[in-house]
Amino acid sequence: GSEMCIRDRWCIGAFTKAKDAIAVLTPVYGAFDTSASDAQRQIIAVPMNRDEDNRYTVDYEAFETAITKHDVKLFIHCNPHNPVGHVWTEDEMNQLFSICERHGVLIISDEIHQDLITGSTPFTSALTVASGAYADNIIAMSSLSKSFNMASLHQAEIIIPNEKLRGQYNAYKTHVYHTDLSLIHISEPTRRSYI
């Protein structure tokens, strides 16, 4: 699924260099750490705050400090968050993404669990936050593997609205192993309907 593309270093390899810093909000899905360290990138763990009701929130000041202190190049955002299940509100994402934009940090948004939500907060794709204001700085991913129990397909959708970033990604992926089934391309009109 989405993690396959990150773990296989497609996006990490296409958009960062060895020793670059990648930020994650912790606790976090272990493959994010592994994929970065396997690619000789450093993970910058920014701990989320947990209250007495086990709800998680972000310390935005700590997030921005970590980004500037470590010269972070990439932020891996997971919505709903894995493993805590937090569904990010548009306001929360707006705050995170504005910090990333201010410091030139690219965002990968893993949205693989978008259909598996409990609670009252609706899923909002990172691509639609602030009426799509951040879309040129976001790479969104999802997969059929969670919602439809199709993990054996090793399939993922990657949506890259920014043409320059899409070109960079397409150039990189020609140098990594893949099967034709894992690279189903979406036509331009269909892709536009997602954002």
What are these regions (language model features)?
Residues R41, R102-V105, A135-D136:
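A short helix->loop->beta-strand "cap" motif at the edges of active sites that frequently abuts
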Residues S2-E3, R7-A21:
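Phosphate-binding glycine-rich loop
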Residues W10-G13, V24-R41:
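Substrate-binding/gating loop at the entrance of the active-site cleft, primarily
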Residues R166-V176, D180, R191-S193:
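Structural signature of PLP-dependent enzymes
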Residues R50-T121:
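Active-site phosphate-binding strand-loop segment of PLP-dependent enzymes
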Residues V129-Q168:
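Active-site PLP attachment segment
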